[in-house]
């Protein structure tokens, strides 16, 4: 009997049910992954008891000699992974990492260039419902209507017209590789600083499969979960000249005590990412995404931009089969495929309805799924999306999902 089961049966039951859901469903949410048992053990360790305001060697509390070790390990491993001059591993989330950069690089009301949310950007890149859109004057760039890829000439034109103080590159639902070198050239042309939010592709960058934004940007932010396969949290990588400003802005600026148990889990995850097999994993993530995209196209789906270069596939289900993203998400959930509705470029549907789905391969790849498995996943998706009310077809789909998940159990 576990300690939780003994002390709190209601919480224990919810956790068990969530484990069963993760084990029995195929996880296709692009921002999710499955951490190792070592990462989970670090996050559930006695470090959760320790307050440690400040930074290694400069704390406001005593007894920090061991959390100093784990935090320093996280910092040094992140530096090695990405070739960064300075790293802050204390942000509790990607949003807080982004907020810290804005507070360093901008004044209230300054102009910023960021990617349109429905074209693949992120809430913190200037959405009017987010602090970023409320505090700063964001000008949006997007993708070309024909190619559905970032229109770098539009970015250049908007930069010259609006003279932003900061340009934000990075996305949450963009399936193509981003040219950070080109963004840097545009930023230099207008005297802007460049921030890259690599939250979704950090694992691909660490493995050397995508351009490393650290080589070009003044500030790089990321989450530590998603493709990086660590605990839920954030991180900032920057040049030495901004180190003191960034550190002061995180603490005492917008956070108090760091979550040292999470930082230890980050250190473990970064250690895993430094192993050679991490590159093999990331290569498989991309191969699986391509197999998923290609098979969906064969099944009659319109895939945004015609394919993928990374870990995700954006699909126009409304344009393909007349079903909304919301309806498709719900139908797929019924048969054990977890994904999320998502706006696609130039979407006419509301954000809670959408015309699209965002499908990601990192989590299932961690379980051992390969190309043939994702070809089968695509065919199951096709069966469900084209027959969302057919009970016999849904039963068939559910059985096929069960066959895949039993073949690749979670936490064997």
UniProtKB/Swiss-Prot annotation:
CDD domains cross-referenced by the UniProt entry: SHMT
GO BP terms: glycine biosynthetic process from serine; tetrahydrofolate interconversion
Keywords on record: Amino-acid biosynthesis, Cytoplasm, One-carbon metabolism, Pyridoxal phosphate, Transferase
A Pfam family: SHMT
Domain of life, per lineage: Bacteria
Pathway where it operates: One-carbon metabolism; tetrahydrofolate interconversion; Amino-acid biosynthesis; glycine biosynthesis; glycine from L-serine: step 1/1
EC identifiers of the protein: 2.1.2.1
Coiled coil ranges: none
Reactions the enzyme catalyzes: (6R)-5,10-methylene-5,6,7,8-tetrahydrofolate + glycine + H2O = (6S)-5,6,7,8-tetrahydrofolate + L-serine
Cellular-component GO terms for this entry: cytosol
InterPro entries, alphabetized: PyrdxlP-dep_Trfase, PyrdxlP-dep_Trfase_major, PyrdxlP-dep_Trfase_small, Ser_HO-MeTrfase, Ser_HO-MeTrfase-like, Ser_HO-MeTrfase_PLP_BS, SHMT-like_dom
Site feature (Plays an important role in substrate specificity) residues: 225
Chief subcellular location: cytoplasm
Biological function: Catalyzes the reversible interconversion of serine and glycine with tetrahydrofolate (THF) serving as the one-carbon carrier. This reaction serves as the major source of one-carbon groups required for the biosynthesis of purines, thymidylate, methionine, and other important biomolecules. Also exhibits THF-independent aldolase activity toward beta-hydroxyamino acids, producing glycine and aldehydes, via a retro-aldol mechanism.
Family affiliation: Belongs to the SHMT family.
HAMAP family: SHMT (MF_00051)
Quaternary state and interactors: Homodimer.
Protein name: Serine hydroxymethyltransferase
């Amino acid at each position: 009997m576990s300690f939780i089961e003994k002390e709190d049966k209601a919480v224990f039951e919810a956790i068990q049910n969530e484990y069963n859901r993760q084990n029995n469903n195929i996880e296709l949410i692009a921002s999710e992954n499955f951490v190792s048992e070592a990462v989970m053990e670090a996050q559930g360790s006695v470090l959760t008891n320790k307050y440690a305001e400040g930074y290694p060697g400069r704390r406001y509390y005593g007894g920090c000699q061991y959390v100093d070790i784990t935090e320093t390990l996280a910092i040094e491993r992140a530096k090695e992974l990405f070739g960064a001059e300075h790293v802050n591993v204390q942000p509790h989330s990607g949003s807080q990492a982004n907020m810290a950069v804005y507070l360093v690089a901008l004044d209230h009301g300054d102009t910023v260039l960021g990617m349109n949310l429905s074209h693949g950007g992120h809430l913190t890149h200037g959405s009017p419902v987010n602090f970023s859109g409320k505090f700063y004057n964001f000008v949006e760039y997007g993708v070309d209507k024909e190619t559905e890829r970032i229109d770098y000439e539009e970015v250049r034109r908007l930069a010259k017209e609006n003279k932003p103080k900061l340009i934000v590159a990075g996305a949450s639902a963009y399936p193509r590789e981003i040219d950070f070198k080109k963004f840097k050239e545009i930023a230099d042309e207008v005297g802007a600083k460049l921030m890259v939010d690599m939250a979704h592709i950090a694992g691909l960058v660490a493995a050397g499969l995508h351009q490393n934004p650290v080589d070009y940007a003044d500030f790089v932010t990321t989450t530590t979960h998603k493709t990086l396969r660590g605990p839920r949290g954030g991180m900032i990588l920057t040049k030495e000249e901004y180190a003191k400003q960034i550190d002061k802005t995180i603490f005492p600026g917008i956070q108090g005590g760091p979550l040292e148990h999470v930082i230890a889990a980050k250190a473990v995850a970064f250690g895993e990412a430094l192993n050679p097999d991490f590159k093999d994993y990331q290569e498989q993530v991309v191969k699986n995404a391509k197999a998923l995209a290609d098979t969906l196209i064969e099944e009659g789906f319109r895939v945004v931009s015609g394919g993928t270069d990374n870990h995700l596939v954006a699909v126009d289900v409304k344009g393909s089969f007349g079903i909304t993203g919301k309806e498709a998400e719900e139908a797929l959930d019924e048969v054990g495929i977890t994904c999320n509705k998502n706006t696609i470029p130039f979407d006419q549907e509301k954000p809670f309805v959408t015309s699209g789905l965002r499908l990601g391969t990192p989590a299932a790849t961690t379980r051992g799924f390969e190309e043939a498995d994702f070809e089968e996943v695509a065919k199951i998706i096709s069966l469900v999306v084209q027959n969302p009310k057919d009970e016999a077809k849904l039963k068939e789909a559910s059985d096929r999902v069960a066959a895949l998940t039993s073949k690749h159990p979670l936490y064997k």
